[in-house]
Amino acid sequence: MSRIAKAPVDVLSGVEVTIAGQEVTVKGKNGTLSRVFNDAVEVVQEENQLKASPREGVANGWAQAGTARSLLDAMVIGVSQGFEKKLQLNGVGYRAAAQGKKLNLTLGFSHPVAYEMPEGISVETPSQTEIVVKGADKQLVGQVAANIRGYRPPEPYKGKGVRYADEVVRRKEAKKK
């Protein structure tokens, strides 16, 4: 039995929720998010709370309800406050510059990397070695940050590369003769 599924999701002020069958749409100041949930889960709105509960006779209903509750919580927080991921560039000559919906990266390749931001994601560069990815969709923000990090993941010997701001890179010692 899922403990997560038993806790209701509080709908914050300024957030509007619409339930149509298995599709839940959440509107807020940061935009609109919509998701179709598994048939094993029933989503119900009671006053200012959303509840995800399993349908009768479904084997993995509580597990699906816990997942649905977490997704609903992320949707409500996303449209009201938004999510952000911070990245840092470590390395000689590694730079980032945001130009509208495009992020230009210089990561030691023979060519600059131009990363086009998907719809609903914004990017800022407070300095040349910092990147801040923002958006309402938690999954998409994380995926964009992972894609940017994937161009040059941090290496363990010198620590060069693109890393998350809170990431700790375990360093290795160089080979000795």
UniProtKB/Swiss-Prot annotation:
Keywords: Ribonucleoprotein, Ribosomal protein, RNA-binding, rRNA-binding. PROSITE patterns: RIBOSOMAL_L6_1. One of its GO terms (molecular function) is rRNA binding. GO terms for biological process: cytoplasmic translation. GO terms for cellular component: cytosolic large ribosomal subunit. InterPro entries: Ribosomal_uL6-like, Ribosomal_uL6-like_a/b-dom_sf, Ribosomal_uL6_a/b-dom, Ribosomal_uL6_bac-type, Ribosomal_uL6_CS. This protein binds to the 23S rRNA, and is important in its secondary structure. It is located near the subunit interface in the base of the L7/L12 stalk, and near the tRNA binding site of the peptidyltransferase center. PANTHER family: 60S/50S RIBOSOMAL PROTEIN L6/L9, LARGE RIBOSOMAL SUBUNIT PROTEIN UL6M. Part of the 50S ribosomal subunit. This is Large ribosomal subunit protein uL6. The lineage of its organism: Bacteria, Pseudomonadati, Pseudomonadota, Gammaproteobacteria, Alteromonadales.
